[in-house]
From Swiss-Prot:
GO terms for biological process: translation. Transmembrane segments: none annotated. The lineage of its organism: Bacteria, Pseudomonadati, Pseudomonadota, Alphaproteobacteria, Rickettsiales. Part of the 50S ribosomal subunit. GO terms for molecular function: rRNA binding; structural constituent of ribosome. It holds the Pfam family Ribosomal_L22. NCBIfam families: rplV_bact. PANTHER family: CHLOROPLAST 50S RIBOSOMAL PROTEIN L22-RELATED (PTHR13501), LARGE RIBOSOMAL SUBUNIT PROTEIN UL22M (PTHR13501:SF8). It comes from Rickettsia massiliae (strain Mtu5). The keyword rRNA-binding applies. One of its GO terms (cellular component) is cytosolic large ribosomal subunit. This is Large ribosomal subunit protein uL22. Keywords: Ribonucleoprotein, Ribosomal protein, RNA-binding, rRNA-binding. PROSITE patterns: RIBOSOMAL_L22 (PS00464). Gene3D superfamilies: Ribosomal protein L22/L17.
Amino acid sequence: MYMVQENKNFATAQAKSIRVSSRKLNLVAAFIRNMKVSEALVQLTFSPKRIAKVVKDCLQSAVANAENNLGLDIDRLVITKATVGKALVMKRVMPRAKGRATRINKFFSNLYITVTEKEDN
């Protein structure tokens, strides 16, 4: 579910096909954007949003990629990008009165998180 892409001083992680609409996921992603990783992990731990647990797992994956693959200092990591994209839509049918039926769309989303090591000034 989590994939890795790394470069010089930043590491990324992505979670694909998360069973939540992109609108709801973007609320949490926008909240942690440009935040220190340590602060974001605390905020996500105590967030009342259901999807915060998945975002936290993806963020921990990005931090692990930065530490293990690139040797970055995890105390100086900042979330520079937290983007959300649309994924597939499951179409379901709900029976209604008088023999009719309506369509129900169940949305999926993709999450991309990039963490960067900031220099102390």
